[in-house]
Amino acid sequence: MAAFIEFLGSETKVSFDDIHILGHSLGAHVAGFVGNYVSQKLGRITGLDPARPAYETPYLKDTEERLDSTDASFVDVIHTCAGSVGFLRPIGHADFYPNGGTFRQPGCPIFSARTMISENCI
């Protein structure tokens, strides 16, 4: 992906400031790798519930190995499973924790796929 962005920058004169990468879970960290490996600072990266296992637990990975605020001019992160399968600590310029960052959503008291579907929670 980094090589493709470099190609776009050289062949089409796309400004790196205009590039916005969005990634979910492991994809959020992949977006961070891309931001770390391109020759110029990307404009924005959005991390949607960056993966926690192997990145924050059992120990915190170095910033070169995960999404962090140095990967783009602006990094925003939305934490919706913070502390379980998603990163708990803030790692962007702006970190949002809707409903406290937990997977438990209002109106959905029991966490099971069957309940979530029957209660129209997804």
Placement of each model-derived feature along the sequence:
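Serine-dependent carboxylesterase/thioesterase catalytic core
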Residues: 1-122
